[in-house]
C-alpha cells in the first residue's frame, strides 16, 4: 500500500480509503440490510481485512443509515484505533447541532477523538454557505469541537465545484476537501488549464479526498449499453480507479467496501500501476 500526505494535516493516509456509505445504507449498491447480525459480522471482517492490508483511512457519516454506518465501523475498529484515521461528518444549522452530532458520533464510533470532521454538503447554495459561516453557525461548532480536542482537523465535502463551494474553500478554515472526482466527473481537476477546485485546494495545502472514484458503476453500465465489446475487453474497475489515482494532487480515493473480497479487489486495482496515466500528457493530446 502506498501512502500520501493529507495536505497540511501532515497525516500519511493510504491512497485507498474505506468508504462507509455502503455499510450503513440499506440496499445501496446492491442488496444489503445494515441492521442484520450478518451485516455487523461482515463489516467487522471487512474492516479488519482493510487494516491488515494497509488501509488506514476510514470515512463514514451520521447520514449513512441514521448512524448505523458509524456504529458498524466502530465495531470493526475495536482494539484497532491507533492504526487508523477516522473521518466522519456533520450537518446542521448551528453550533449546538454540530456539538450534538459530534458527541453522538464519538459514542457510535467508540472513540474519544475524531481525526477529521467534515461538513457534509452536496451542491452548495447561498443559504448553505450562510448557515455554515455565520456567527454561531456550523463552522463555529466545528472549530469549538476542534479547540476542545474532540476532533483534530476540519474539512467539507461537495458533490461538485460551484461558486459557493469555492467560498467555503476561500475561508482557509478547512484542512481537507472531499469532492466527487472520476473519469466521468473530471472538471474539479483540469490539467489542460491547471484549473479547478482541486488545484485551488492544493494551493492552500489542503488534503484532497476523491469520492466515487469508480463512478459507483455508472461508467461501466454506460459502456455496457453503448459498447459492450469495449466493456468486456478492459477491467474498468481497475481502469477507473487508476485514472483517479493518477492525479498527483490527490491524497486518498475512498471506495465502498462491504466484504473482505472487495477490499482485496480494490487494493489489487490500486497496485496495478500499469494502468496509471500522465493526466497532463493525456489532456495535452486530446483536449
Question: Predicted regions: what is each one?
Answer:
Residues 6, 18, 50, 58, ...:
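Conserved, mostly hydrophobic/aromatic
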Residues 61-70, 91-98, 124-126, 162, ...:
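Acidic-and-aromatic substrate-binding clefts and catalytic sites of carbohydrate-active enzymes
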Residues 3, 40, 121-287:
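Beta/alpha (TIM)-barrel catalytic core signal, keyed to glycine-rich beta->alpha loops juxtaposed to Asp/Glu
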Residues 23-41, 87-97, 224-234:
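Active-site mouth loops of central-metabolism enzymes
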Residues 106-129:
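Active-site groove signature of glycoside hydrolases
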Residues 1-84:
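N-terminal binding-site loop/beta-alpha segment at the start of enzyme catalytic domains
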Residues 33-50, 95-110, 160-169, 236-243:
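Short, acidic/polar
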